[in-house]
Curated annotation (Swiss-Prot):
Organism: Mus musculus
Phosphoserine modification, residue list: 30, 82, 85, 89, 325, 330
SUPFAM superfamilies registered for this protein in UniProt: P-loop containing nucleoside triphosphate hydrolases (SSF52540)
Cell division recorded as keyword: yes
Encoding gene (name): Septin9
Full protein name: Septin-9
CDD domains reported for this sequence: CDC_Septin
Residue ranges of domain Septin-type G in the record: 293-565
PANTHER family noted in UniProt: SEPTIN
G3 motif, as annotated region: 360-363
Length: 583
């Protein structure tokens, strides 16, 4: 009599073979076919057929269409047999089969254990029992991508204790041995197929099959000659790049459907915010329009000859914009009238184009009698306003009116170290009403630090006492932020500046400055002079504000006055030419 222990059995050659643990992770790679003997025969024997691959290969074409469903009729037939058989016996059935020879030759071993250790001896024959799933191993000749599996199905039947081995050749299995399991029965079979270690993590869902009772004759006729072959479907590694391969219908699994749709959802753009309108894009639209049209800026420099007006303009824009005055002859040293010159230069920086116009006033303050020397400058400013006004009132006016209005006037104060001259006070008092005046102390490097501080204090006091409102004006501050920024600039007025268009190397850096015996004066160094603050005010922070005040304040005042004069002249019936006079 052959003894059988849990997990150990003896083969026909006398060697002990350890059965695979139902819950163990290892996969078997041996192919085994076991034949079943009649219940009344001698103790069970086991035949190991290691060379069955050649025999199975000849009949493997017949099992190509067999699937997992072939294991279901075998479980159902064995269940019916165990219910009707009077002999208490424990049977273990291992069935083998092969799949299609195209990708590989495979074989599945199904072990059915019927033991009375798991239930009570008085339990009813029709009572439900659990079927535990053992590991499945499929072995065959294959490419490196597929992974073999081996399936073991253990069926426990109450009131049976004898272990019997059933071995049947695979050549006797017909193709039509599948019986659909659709009827309800108290027994359930749970099948769990673990995935390979290298495959993606995709567990097989538990499948519950309910079997119905079958006649004994039908059971014996189907069980002995035709053992079912449980073929575990698999997919190649090449086919499982997007979604992991699992046993069962992947299309019916909602979780797999979500995995298939996940990559597509990542490529989709995030939807725009529901409340977003797009008003902030107006800034980009204005920027593109301004880049196409460019900007215009007109600056006037007023002061005596030799104060460095042209040099300062060239230093501001770092280019040869303003030409230096040519030394006149002895007959031409004293000009009869003030000559106003305009120089236009196109500047482009980082794709931004600006049309810069510099208005120079040579001869201002160079006369012995400087009375009313400010009138030619006042007339020039008003003429530009009149020209712009006539373009506006035309019936067919231009789409874009050329802007020649003076936006800013730099008034150069000689570095005397005392106070403002009467000419300086009279000029700034009259022109501050029609143009933005920015007073500067020319050639401030001729003053010591103490002299410069004292001179600036005296100039500030003279401006306040004479009611001269220079730029930036307090009344034009729009909000608290503008007021805070403008107050810092007002404290620096007048700006003590030094101009130079010569470059020097200081500590490996290129600078604009003036070189002397005791050192180099750096133009853009705020500890040496206030040129950097003047540049920021005119170009980097307040250029657009200067243009807006010119258009909305000074030009608007001139336009109102001219329209009032025109209405009064029409009322009196007198037509007279407009005169450039103080406003």
């Amino acid at each position: 009599m052959k003894k059988s222990y849990s997990g150990v059995t003896r083969t026909s050659s006398g060697r002990l073979r350890r059965l695979a643990d139902p819950t163990g992770p290892a996969l078997k790679r041996s192919f085994e076919v076991e034949e079943i003997e009649p219940p009344n025969s001698t103790p069970p024997r086991r035949v190991q057929t290691p060379l069955l691959r050649a025999t199975v290969a000849s009949s493997s074409q017949k099992f190509q269409d067999l699937g997992v469903k072939n294991s279901e009729p075998a479980a159902r037939l064995v269940d019916s047999l165990s219910q009707r058989s009077p002999k208490p016996s424990l049977r273990r059935v291992e069935l083998a089969g092969a799949k299609a020879p195209e990708p590989m030759s495979r074989r599945t071993e199904i072990s059915i254990d019927i033991s009375s250790k798991q239930v009570e001896s008085t339990a009813s024959a029709a009572g439900p029992s659990r079927f535990g799933l053992k590991r499945a191993e499929v072995l065959g000749h294959k490419t490196p991508e597929p992974v073999p599996r081996r399936t073991e199905i253990t069926i426990v039947k109450p009131q049976e204790s004898v272990l019997r081995r059933v071995e049947t050749p695979a050549s006797k299995i017909p193709e039509g041995s599948a019986v659909p399991a659709t009827d309800a029965a108290p027994k359930r079979v749970e099948i769990q197929v673990p995935k390979p270690a290298e495959a993606p993590n995709c567990p097989l869902p538990s499948q519950t099959l309910e079997n119905s009772e079958a006649p004994m004759s039908q059971l014996q006729s189907r069980l002995e000659p035709r053992p079912s072959v449980a073929e575990v479907p698999y997919r190649n590694q090449e086919d499982s790049e997007v979604t992991p391969s699992c046993v069962g219908d992947m299309a019916d699994n909602p979780r797999d459907a979500m995995l298939k749709q996940a990559p597509a959802s990542r490529n989709e753009k995030a939807p725009m915010e529901f409340g977003y309108v797009g008003i902030d894009s107006i800034l980009e639209q204005m920027r593109r329009k301004a880049m196409k049209q460019g900007f215009e800026f007109n600056i006037m420099v007023v002061g005596q000859s030799g104060l460095g007006k042209s040099t300062l303009i060239n230093t501001l824009f770092k280019s040869k914009i303003s030409r230096k005055s040519v030394q006149p002859t002895s007959e031409e040293r004293i000009p009869k009238t003030i000559e106003i010159k305009s120089i236009t230069h196109d500047i482009e920086e980082k794709g931004v184009r600006m049309k810069l116009t510099v208005i120079d006033t040579p001869g201002f303050g160079d006369h012995i009698n400087n009375e009313n020397c400010w009138q030619p400058i006042m007339k020039f400013i008003n003429d530009q306003y009149e020209k712009y006004l006539q373009e506006e009132v035309n019936i067919n006016r231009k789409k874009r009116i050329p802007d020649t209005r003076v936006h800013c006037c730099l008034y150069f104060i000689p570095a005397t170290g005392h106070s403002l001259r009467p000419l300086d006070i009279e000029f700034m008092k009259r022109l501050s009403k029609v143009v933005n005046i920015v007073p500067v102390i020319a050639k401030a490097d001729t003053l010591t630090l103490e002299e410069r501080v004292y001179f600036k204090q005296r100039i500030t006091a003279d401006l306040l006492s004479n009611g001269i409102d220079v730029y930036p004006q307090k009344e034009f501050d729009e909000d608290a932020e503008d007021r805070l920024v403008n107050e810092k600039f007002r404290e620096m007025i007048p700006f003590a500046v030094v101009g130079s268009d010569h470059e020097y190397q200081v500590n490996g850096k290129r600078i604009l400055g003036r070189k002397t015996k005791w050192g180099t004066i750096e133009v853009e160094n705020t500890t040496h002079c206030e040129f950097a603050y003047l540049r920021d005010l005119l170009i980097r922070t307040h250029m657009q504000n200067i243009k807006d005040i010119t258009s909305n304040i000074h030009f608007e005042a001139y336009r109102v006055k001219r329209l009032n004069e025109g209405n009064s002249a029409m009322a009196n019936g007198i037509e007279k030419e407009p005169e450039a006079q103080e406003m």
